[in-house]
C-alpha cells in the first residue's frame, strides 16, 4: 500500500468524523510536543512519521534517525503545530513509532544473537494484513533482510504444493520455462532425503524446515560436496537461544517469522511543552 494512502487510512481510523475535543476547544494555539522513550530500543518509523506530520501541517523540529538506539527518557522527536492537530495525530504517530520500533528492536536482538556476518537473517510473509510493507521496512531498520514480499517474488514450493507434484525434476523444468528469467525456485524440505531430492531436481534454494541443528548440518555438508551453488535456508521455530547454533550449521540464511509476529510495542509517550 502506498505510504500516503496507508497514513490517511490510519488517521481516519482514529479520527472518525472528527475529534470531539476540537468542538469544545475555545481557541486554538501553537504548541510544542515531545515524543519520548519509556524503554530502550532501536528507532524505526521515521519515514512514516515525517510523512504523517507533513500531511497534517505539523513541523518536525528534530528527530532521531531510523536504526538509532535510544534509552528511557530520550527525546525521539520534537514537533510543533496547532494544539488541536497535535492531539489529533498523537495516537496514530505513537502507534506507528511504537510498532515499527518494536519490530526493529526485536530484530536487532536476533542479529546480535546470530553473531555472524556470513549468514543472513530474513523475515517471512507472516505479517499483519495490509501492513506487510510497513513491517518489513521495520525489519530492515533492525538490521535483517527481507524474504519474499509476495507470491510474485519467487516460486516457493511447500508441502501443500508438493503433494500434487508427481515428478519434481520434470515440474521444475516446466516451471523454468514459464517463470521470469530472474525468478528463483525454493523448495521447503522436512528431511535429509527431501533436501537431497530438491537439489537433484534443480532447486535454487533449499529450505530446511523445522529440522534440528544436526540434521541441518548434514544437509549443508551434502550440499557443499555435491551442489555448492545451491543456497540453504534454515527456518521453523528458531529462537534467540538457538539461532547461533543454526548459524554455525552451514546455511546461508535463517528466516524467522517471530521478528514480526512476536514483536511488542516499544513504550513511548508524547508530552506537551
Question: What are these model-derived regions, one by one?
Answer:
Residues 1-190, 194-201, 205, 217-218, ...:
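Acidic/glycine-rich phosphate/pyrophosphate-binding loops and surrounding catalytic core
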Residues 210, 236, 258:
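Short secondary-structure boundary segments
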Residues 223:
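Conserved hydrophobic residues forming the short capping helix/wall of the S-adenosyl-L-methionine
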Residues 234-235, 240:
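Structured functional modules or segments
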Residues 269-273:
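Active-site loop ensemble at the mouth of alpha/beta enzyme cores that anchors a bound cofactor
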